[in-house]
């Protein structure tokens, strides 16, 4: 049975009302639906995202985008997810395990260099120490503050699951390429960060030109195109933002969890 639209029902009601006076009184739409805010609250759809786990799911699936900060009421949830419960580690392990199984089953080309592209921040290295200082993403910081923090030589510890994948990829005969949106200005501190995490080998470490304001998704897409033109066979990509993984992305992509911030894609 087809469901009549609201407008059609109102039209029918008006017709019947005209032919039979007093039978039906049309009701104003405001009376029907009430206050929108009250409806949202009633249906648990308010922008406060009282269910932080559902908010997080929306972030990871790219249904919730363009958020400036983590909802204030989700601070404890994010801290528990990242630190206390170890769910972050479990989720990352699942992603990296699937990436390894995929890579292990590949028929690699013999006439070219097979490469796997790794994002850097919150893929191989963690920014959690920085965001922990600002309410686990609930406090808004100045643009560029993270990069200035990096410049102080601050520690960005390695993320064990992605580091394990990195080692496995090398053992499979696939060359790792690290593609970061850090400016070349931070090359020395980046090398220190990587060495401290045990990352000492790569085919290329690609950093963004100093002062570049190119959007991350555009910048990384251009780099991938350039690598393909040079003859590299990109078999896989892994990152914590969809901006790392969309637009002209050869090979399969693997998305790591990150509830701390959003990079437009």
From Swiss-Prot:
One Pfam family linked to the record: Acid_phosphat_B
Keywords: Glycoprotein, Signal, Storage protein
InterPro entries: Acid_phosphat_B-like, Acid_phosphatase_pln, APS1/VSP, HAD-like_sf, HAD_sf
Keyword Nucleotidyltransferase included in the entry's annotation: no
GO molecular function, one term: acid phosphatase activity
Residue positions the entry lists as glycosylated: 110, 188, 210
SUPFAM superfamilies, sorted: HAD-like
Signal peptide: 1-18
GO BP annotations, alphabetical order: defense response to insect; response to copper ion; response to insect; response to jasmonic acid; response to oxidative stress; response to wounding
GO CC entries: cytosolic ribosome; plant-type vacuole
Reported induction: Expression is enhanced during wounding.
Tissue: Highly expressed in flowers, but also found in leaves, vegetative shoots, petioles, peduncles, and receptacles of floral organs.
Function: May function as somatic storage protein during early seedling development.
PANTHER family: ACID PHOSPHATASE-LIKE PROTEIN, VEGETATIVE STORAGE PROTEIN 1-RELATED
Family under the similarity heading: Belongs to the APS1/VSP family.
Name of the protein in question: Vegetative storage protein 2
């Amino acid at each position: 049975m087809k469901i009549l639209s609201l407008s059609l029902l109102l039209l029918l009601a008006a017709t019947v009302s005209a032919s039979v006076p007093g039978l039906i009184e049309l009701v104003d739409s405001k009376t029907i639906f009430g206050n929108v805010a009250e409806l949202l609250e009633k249906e648990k759809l308010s922008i406060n995202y009282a269910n932080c786990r559902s908010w997080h799911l929306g972030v990871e699936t790219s249904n919730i985008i363009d958020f400036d900060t983590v909802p204030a009421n989700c601070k404890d949830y994010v801290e528990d997810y990242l630190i206390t419960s170890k769910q972050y580690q479990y989720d990352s392990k699942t992603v990296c395990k699937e990436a390894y199984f995929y890579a292990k089953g590949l028929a690699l080309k013999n006439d070219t260099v097979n490469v796997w592209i790794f994002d850097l921040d919150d893929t191989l290295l963690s920014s959690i120490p920085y965001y922990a200082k600002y309410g686990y993403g609930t406090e808004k910081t100045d643009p560029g503050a993270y990069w200035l923090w990096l410049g102080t030589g601050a520690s960005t510890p390695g993320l064990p699951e992605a580091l394990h994948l990195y080692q496995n990829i090398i053992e499979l005969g696939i060359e790792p390429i690290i593609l970061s949106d850090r400016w070349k200005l931070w090359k020395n501190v980046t090398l220190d960060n990587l060495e401290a995490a045990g990352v000492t080998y790569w085919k290329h470490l690609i950093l963004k030109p100093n002062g570049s304001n190119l959007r991350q998704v555009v910048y990384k897409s251009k780099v991938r195109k350039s690598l393909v033109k040079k003859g590299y066979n990109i078999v896989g990509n892994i990152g914590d933002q969809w901006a790392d993984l969309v637009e002209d992305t050869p090979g399969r992509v693997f998305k790591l969890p990150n509830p701390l911030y959003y990079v437009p894609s």
